[in-house]
Amino acid sequence: VDLDRCYPTAEEMEPKVKGAFAWLDETGSASNECWADYQKKLAAWTANRAKFEAFLADFDEFKERVAPWVKKPEYIADCMHKANAPCRYSVLNFPVDEKTVRWAITYCHLMRNRFSVIDLLHFTGVWNDEFVQMLLDRAEAMDAGL
């Protein structure tokens, strides 16, 4: 992991965040609200760099510790199918079209001040269009997703 690349500046991220949500309304209030929240998360991420470095140093131990609680997507999809739960965005009570699903998944990490594994994937350079497509393809192979 290139640590320096894991820490974009506010100047780098502001146009990305605002651009992702600009289409939601003409006034820009939605994109401004997302940026207001996101910049807090970005500042906290930057302030905690030493903790991330320690996490990386102990990553193998971390993986062993959490492995018993991590379930494979295939297991979760199988449980959902067995429960007759909706496994596709298109069959929800309020169906979501493919374009909106792709947008929501691609930019979900930019909308709020709540750190998730997707933020970690983004900051380490993993979360991109190709990765999102891989997730959608994997979901499709499980009769889930779009």
What are these regions (language model features)?
Residues 2-146:
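C-terminal charged capping/lid subdomain of soluble metabolic enzymes
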